[in-house]
Amino acid sequence: MTIRLVTFDLDNTLWHVDTVIRRAEKETHNWIQPRVPEYASYMTTENVASLRARVMEENPGIRHDVSALRIQMMRRAFEQCGLRRTEADAKAREAFAVFIRWRNTITFYDGAQDTLSTLSNRYQLAALTNGNADVQKVGLDSYFSFAISAADVGSSKPSPEMFLEAMHRAEVSPDHAVHVGDHPIDDIEGANRVGMHSIWVNFDGKTDRVPADATVTDLPSLVGAIATLEDS
C-alpha cells in the first residue's frame, strides 16, 4: 500500500490551542477596554452564551465559520454597549484583527516542524481544521500543499466534507490517504467514516480505546507510523 496524502488537524495536534486562545482573547479585551469600556461588564458568561445562540440562530450560514461568528458576536455586543451599527461593525472588525494576529502566534509542540519537513518530502500534506488558524501566518505553508477549514466547506469535522474535499484536491482515493489528529471523534472517527486511514496523536497517554490504525504519543513517531502503514 502506498500513502500519497497525509492530512493534519492543527489545534491540539501541532500546538496547544487553549493557551493560544486565552492569550488572544486577553489581548483583544485589552484593546477593546479603552475604546468600549462597557464591553467587559457586558460580556458575562450568561450574556456570551445567549449572544452566541442568538447570532447563530439569526445567521445559520456562519455556524461553521468561527471567524465570522466571533465578529458578529462582538458587533452585537458593541451595539448593546451603545455603539451605532456601523461603528459597532467597524470596531468588531478592528478587534478581530487583534484577535486573529494573536490566534496565529503559536508555540509548536516538540518536533512538529521537523516532522512536517520530513513528511512533506515523501507525501502531499494538507491541513484540515474546524478553527481559523492560518498555515501561512503560523509559518507552515511551506509544508502543506493546501489547507481546508470548516468555513471553506460549510461543515465541521467529523462530517465528511473536509476529508472528501482534501482527497478530491489531491486526486487520491481513501486507501492512499491518512489523517492525523488528536480528537477521537472529529479526527479519527471522521476519517474512518470516509475510508481513510487514521493516526491518533495521544500526547497525554489516555487509555481510551480509539479505533485508529495507529497511535503516537509524540509527533516525530509519525514518520515511522506512516511507514508501517505502508508496509502493512
Which positions does each model-derived feature cover?
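N-terminal helical cap/lid subdomain that shapes the substrate entry/recognition surface
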Residues: 2-110
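Asp-based, Mg2+/Mn2+-dependent phosphohydrolase catalytic module
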Residues: 1-6, 17-18, 34, 41, ...
